[in-house]
């Protein structure tokens, strides 16, 4: 999943852009930032859940 996100980021940064050499539009950058924030929030939630799971297993 991370590779797909990296690919999207590369596309937005112009590494693998298929259209002309136009710079990324501001809406592209806005959605890129939004995707990054959602990804970071998901990772944080998974980290917190993993810690809760560890605590539960320690109690058993």
From Swiss-Prot:
**PROSITE patterns, alphabetized:** CRF
Low complexity: which segments have biased composition?
A: 1-14
In the record, what terms sit under GO molecular function?
hormone activity
Q: Where does it live in the cell?
A: Secreted
Instruction: Tell me the segments the record calls region Disordered.
Output: 1-22
- Mind naming one GO cellular-component term on file for this protein? extracellular region
Keyword tags = Amidation, Cleavage on pair of basic residues, Hormone, Secreted
Q: Main subcellular localization, coarse class?
A: secreted
- SMART domains in the record: CRF (SM00039)
Valine amide found at: 60
Question: What role is this protein assigned?
Answer: Urotensin is found in the teleost caudal neurosecretory system. It has a suggested role in osmoregulation and as a corticotropin-releasing factor. The non-hormonal portion of this precursor may be a urotensin binding protein, urophysin.
Q: Name the family.
A: Belongs to the sauvagine/corticotropin-releasing factor/urotensin I family.
UniProt name for this protein: UI
- UniProt organism field: Platichthys flesus
């Amino acid at each position: 999943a991370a590779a797909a996100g990296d690919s999207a980021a590369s596309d937005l940064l112009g590494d693998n852009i298929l259209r002309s050499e136009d710079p990324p539009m501001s809406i592209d950058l806005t959605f890129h930032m939004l995707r990054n924030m959602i990804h970071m929030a998901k990772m944080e939630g998974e980290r917190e859940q993993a810690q809760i799971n560890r605590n539960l297993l320690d109690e058993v």
